[in-house]
């Protein structure tokens, strides 16, 4: 379990329109609003947990982390894309699975606090066989996080450490 309590006697500056995403890597940071010259005002408590499974040779096979921010009251001056302005933020997390060194699957997500909507979903997968590397990305943003959505794939052949040949495609998905 992890916990972060932030207290500021000052009110937040109005940064509600900045383009900043909250993710599992900055959720437990005091600078999570993404502004060097501004502090998050009011009181907040961030709760979450990390879990990992390692192989016998200490290689990480599975890891997950999930967290959520709780505030004593709404603060409409905080970034709308992050849901930090609500009493309880989105549930934010990451799941990584790598059963072998040749396969890595990584998933970042933001789920609405009542878990009925996924507001942000970013899935990456990478498969390496000999010198061939294939990777896939899928992004979907909903509601206040944004409206971008795409699927991309990259196929590469690595001749040596400094030379490779790659082929990339990306399909943007248009949503209303």
Please report, for each region that a protein language model flagged, where it lies by residue.
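Outer-membrane beta-barrel translocator/pore domains, especially the C-terminal barrels
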Residues: 2-176
